[in-house]
Amino acid sequence: MDQKILWDCHMHSSFSADSDTPMEEMIQTAADQGLTGICFTEHFDPDYPDTPENLDFSLNIPAYRQKLESLADAFKDQIQVNFGIELGLQPQLAESFSDLLKEVPFDFVIGSSHVVHGYDPYYPSYFEGRKESACYMEYFESILENIAAFDEMDVYGHIDYVVRYGPNQNRQYSYGRYKEILDEILRTLIRKNVGIELNTGGYHYGLGEPNPCVNIIRRYRELGGEIITIGADAHTPDKISYAF
């Protein structure tokens, strides 16, 4: 018998630069779906490169916290609403992130790789003039750099995020092709007691699998990993609990 997933632990609202949805709309939709709880994980990506859309991934944390706590109280009889953050990891940000987590009592912290040496794979410029495989490898190497600098997150987000935006997506990608470095990432996370996220956004992007892919999740368990959270990475109400 299939078990229903009752929590969505990765979502965004208009407090994130890439979402226009009011927080209350996200909460109401999740409550209407019958979820037990949700966790907002608004983007905080200092040192984010310039983008064609001029996106600002800074985060007004006091305003975000105040709004969330107010709405969590208003919806307390319908759904539990937790206070999280998605940190856009880069090695030079480690100290400032550590200071932030000492100051602000987040319920849940995702650490994610969005920027690799000044480029976000979301944009084609990351892949221009290079082999797709080299771009994927650079992305995975950057995860190891980030973990070495900072390990205070609860989980590492969408470990193969880069595949969503590759020219061929996952048609030429597999766990086996990058096994050595992916195993190093997984072993390092396990040693540091950092979990991984099963991000169902991969289905939304047409991969036919979550991020990371199923074989990475299986390998994480084979290596002894025990911490797995599930989130849809929703930026709009229709993507809440997507493919759960």
Where are these regions (language model features)?
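Hydrophobic residues within beta-strands of alpha/beta enzymes
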Residues: 38-40, 109, 156, 196, ...
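His/Asp/Glu-enriched short active-site or ligand-binding loop at hydrolase and phosphoryl-transfer sites
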Residues: 193-205
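Charged helix-capping and loop-helix junction motifs
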Residues: 21-24, 173-183, 209-218
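An N-terminally biased module of ancient metal coordination in phosphate/nucleic-acid-related enzymes
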Residues: 1-91, 100-103, 165-176, 200, ...
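Anion (oxyanion) recognition and catalysis
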Residues: 31, 190, 221-222
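H/E-rich (His + Asp/Glu) clusters that bind or coordinate divalent metals
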Residues: 203-244
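Extended substrate/RNA-proximal surfaces in nucleic-acid metabolism proteins
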Residues: 54-191
